[in-house]
From Swiss-Prot:
It holds the Pfam family DUF134. It comes from the Bacteria. It comes from Desulfitobacterium hafniense (strain DSM 10664 / DCB-2). Coiled coil: none annotated. This is UPF0251 protein Dhaf_1981.
Length: 125
């Protein structure tokens, strides 16, 4: 029997989920898809300055898992920048942290409001 899925904890969704060249009407061959959990590792490690160990604790996964996610995220980011492809952030194996009782205790709800992060899961209106 396979191990049950361990969801990766994400503080907030990106305000914009599509980045790329302004002069390109990109089809699928000109897109790079980054998952929300890959985006979260870039945010925590590169923007917030956390170590991979600290990032792993925040996302509720092993450090080796974060390392793999981070490597893939950086490859996708580089491919988008170097090859002029649109970066589309969507999907992944994640759950939004509510920042409340069962949350991380790091004030995710307050941070989402301050940063303007979306608190809606994909498909919600």
């Amino acid at each position: 029997m396979p191990r049950p899925m361990k969801w990766r904890k994400v503080c907030c969704l990106p305000e914009s989920n599509r980045f790329g060249p302004l002069d390109l009407n990109a089809g699928d061959q000109y897109q790079v898809k980054m998952t929300v959990d890959e985006y979260e590792t870039i945010r925590l490690i590169d923007l917030e300055g956390f170590t991979q160990e600290e990032c792993a604790k925040k996302m509720n996964v092993a450090r080796t898992t974060v390392q793999g996610i981070y490597i893939e995220a950086r490859k996708k980011l580089a491919e988008s920048l170097v090859n002029g492809k649109v970066l589309q952030i969507e999907g992944g194996e994640y759950r939004l942290c509510d920042g409340l009782g069962n949350g991380c205790g790091q004030g995710c709800y307050k941070r989402r409001r301050r940063m303007g992060c979306s608190g809606k899961e994909e498909g919600e209106d």
